[in-house]
Amino acid sequence: MEQRASLDSEESESPPQENSCLDPPDRDPNCKPPPVKPHIFTTRSRTRLFGKGDSEEASPLDCPYEEGGLASCPIITVSSVLTIQRPGDGPASVRPSSQDSVSAGEKPPRLYDRRSIFDAVAQSNCQELESLLPFLQRSKKRLTDSEFKDPETGKTCLLKAMLNLHNGQNDTIALLLDVARKTDSLKQFVNASYTDSYYKGQTALHIAIERRNMTLVTLLVENGADVQAAANGDFFKKTKGRPGFYFGELPLSLAACTNQLAIVKFLLQNSWQPADISARDSVGNTVLHALVEVADNTVDNTKFVTSMYNEILILGAKLHPTLKLEEITNRKGLTPLALAASSGKIGVLAYILQREIHEPECRHLSRKFTEWAYGPVHSSLYDLSCIDTCEKNSVLEVIAYSSSETPNRHDMLLVEPLNRLLQDKWDRFVKRIFYFNFFVYCLYMIIFTAAAYYRPVEGLPPYKLKNTVGDYFRVTGEILSVSGGVYFFFRGIQYFLQRRPSLKSLFVDSYSEILFFVQSLFMLVSVVLYFSQRKEYVASMVFSLAMGWTNMLYYTRGFQQMGIYAVMIEKMILRDLCRFMFVYLVFLFGFSTAVVTLIEDGKNNSLPMESTPHKCRGSACKPGNSYNSLYSTCLELFKFTIGMGDLEFTENYDFKAVFIILLLAYVILTYILLLNMLIALMGETVNKIAQESKNIWKLQRAITILDTEKSFLKCMRKAFRSGKLLQVGFTPDGKDDYRWCFRVDEVNWTTWNTNVGIINEDPGNCEGVKRTLSFSLRSGRVSGRNWKNFALVPLLRDASTRDRHATQQEEVQLKHYTGSLKPEDAEVFKDSMVPGEK
């Protein structure tokens, strides 16, 4: 019998090459030969690229080019010629096999290996696979056996066929599914996935969805494909600096993130295995979280993401009326709304905050309710759930305390209702508390300055208290100063424990807190030195005093013009000045070491050599005008930086030309080059900040507002909470739908004629509306020349609202709710829908 073996490559399109060798005639043709040892020139197995410590290449999903690999399992075929040795005969006689084993005209059975199957499915050649089922049944094998899978990636012939579609189809897919069904391995075969670390978990259903093929998706689901299979390989994870596509791992999320609404509806509504709309991936993200993750703030992307988000939300409400899909959090404790805020997806954030659904059965999904409209002016109620600071991981906290690298951080605070909510908090209580704190801090610094100025100077500390009025005032001032230092110290500790800023964002986002904390440290060190009878306490005290007056700039954020100026100073110190100082110190140290090497004390070129009584170098030589030390030379070179240097500050050197060249080079690099670069960089920083100065100032004020709220007790936070508890309709189970809402009056001259509606009679005839409108009128926002710049208009409009072409009725009369509400202070807001109509 002839034994054939071929080098296997899963991607090759050429027929296998065979090498024959003699085999004993009595050997079973179906027996499995021993494994072939790998060739010494075969390539190593590929593993993932981006794992820790990995350096190998990442393999593609499918490639038509051949790559060296291990030898495949040998192919066993029936030879057409047999060599038989009989007793008594002479030399071995050769005769045709048809005389003993195979009848004339009968074809030998077709045998398959991984390579032959892969080649057939890649070419969509069903004829090559006609004998596959008899072969598997005869050999008692299945397509899910390891010998029919890629040893490196775990790819099966079904996955190979899904990756090689011709005009959107591959005829071998149905054939392979039928073969797997008849070999009792259909479910395992359909759900077989990649096993390598890069594409781990990807199944045929994922590929069919990615190929946007509804027919194949239906075929796979009908045959038992797992609609909850998770593709969690490295390629499907979101890691900074790594190429890949994160879509939420699940097939439903993949269909949603690739904008395939038909497949989304099929996965949720099919009768074979409906997908779980609330399923979460390995990081706890649902399909809504995944949609937020794939948003990139471009117009087209935002439009498709918000549209898909809206469709899934409505579909989920119809399939599972009591499920609160938007309230599901991931492992970081973030809802889709909070995730949009933390990642800077301003378009998605604006859509969610301003979503208004008019369908009666889905109106409970709205976060915005239009209360009344009159011309271009309309009053809206915004749901404050997940927005206000009363809840954990609220949108306001996420935006205000996010990293400075978060995109659109400043602009997100201008989206309604965030902009008006912060303004309401500032006007109602934060402004008064902030100004009071400013007054107290000024008083504290005055007392601290007086206590430091009138400190005793005779003797060693601690000083005895004299029975004089001045000493009593001094000691009282010292006690108050130390108490303030202790307060700022523990406040800084509390801040760092709560926020836990990273080292990268520590100096950028926590600039003011660090300065107050350092001020308190200097004060506490001064106290320790004072009671240790060390007069050095004065040095630490004056540093604390200087930083205390500098930190008064923190309170300029309560005033727009001064707040912007303080922001510019902070940015220039952190960005421009730090970089300048690093380069300048390198130049200063380098040229100082060069100059001090040339200087020799006692060496004077203008005097004879006999007049130099001695030569010395280093710290041991201390004449009156010695420059033979690094410290004194650095001071002299620093004078050159500010234009006060003298090229002949010493003559104790040899090689005068070299000395002058060093000084001139230093002056050119520092005084002419570096200082002018610093001025240019500062000018650029000022221009950048000036363009968005108001937004930056609003962010600083927002942080101040939230810090003030956090300083309250829980009972006080509820008392100062913005908005009111209102009834906005009914829940899906027929109960009253109470929301904590905040009223915002808006003006829109663009679409006002398509949104004319009067929800309440006598628009504006309520206390809250009067208060809001009167505030706007007092601010001059609606009067005369400022009407077009009415500040009630949100910066970002809901994409679904812009695309809605259906006009509404000009006047909508809604029924009044006459029943009693459980919350006594709740205002009633209902639409025309009654519970029986739902």
Curated annotation (Swiss-Prot):
Residues spanning the membrane: 433-453, 472-497, 511-531, 536-556, 572-599, 658-686
Annotated region (Disordered), positions in chain: 1-63, 86-109
Stretch list, region Required for PIP2-mediated channel inhibition: 777-792
Gene Ontology molecular functions: ATP binding; calcium channel activity; calmodulin binding; chloride channel regulator activity; excitatory extracellular ligand-gated monoatomic ion channel activity; extracellular ligand-gated monoatomic ion channel activity; identical protein binding; intracellularly gated calcium channel activity
Keyword Signal: no
Sequence positions that bind resiniferatoxin: Y511, S512, T550, R557
InterPro entries documented for this protein: Ankyrin_rpt (IPR002110), Ankyrin_rpt-contain_sf (IPR036770), Ion_trans_dom (IPR005821), TRPV (IPR024862), TrpV1-4 (IPR008347)
Top-rank taxon, per record: Eukaryota
PTM statement from Swiss-Prot or TrEMBL: Phosphorylation by PKA reverses capsaicin-induced dephosphorylation at multiple sites, probably including Ser-116 as a major phosphorylation site. Phosphorylation by CAMKII seems to regulate binding to vanilloids. Phosphorylated and modulated by PRKCE, PRKCM and probably PRKCZ. Dephosphorylation by calcineurin seems to lead to receptor desensitization and phosphorylation by CAMKII recovers activity.
Reported impact of K155A: Abolishes ATP binding. Abolishes CALM binding. Impairs normal desensitization by repeated exposure to capsaicin
Pfam families on file: Ank, Ank_2, Ion_trans
Gene Ontology biological process terms in this record: behavioral response to pain; calcium ion import across plasma membrane; calcium ion transmembrane transport; calcium ion transport; cellular response to acidic pH; cellular response to alkaloid; cellular response to ATP; cellular response to cytokine stimulus
Domain note: The association domain (AD) is necessary for self-association.
Known role: Non-selective calcium permeant cation channel involved in detection of noxious chemical and thermal stimuli. Seems to mediate proton influx and may be involved in intracellular acidosis in nociceptive neurons. Involved in mediation of inflammatory pain and hyperalgesia. Sensitized by a phosphatidylinositol second messenger system activated by receptor tyrosine kinases, which involves PKC isozymes and PCL. Activation by vanilloids, like capsaicin, and temperatures higher than 42 degrees Celsius.
Protein name: Transient receptor potential cation channel subfamily V member 1
Species of origin: Rattus norvegicus
Origin organism lineage: Eukaryota, Metazoa, Chordata, Craniata, Vertebrata
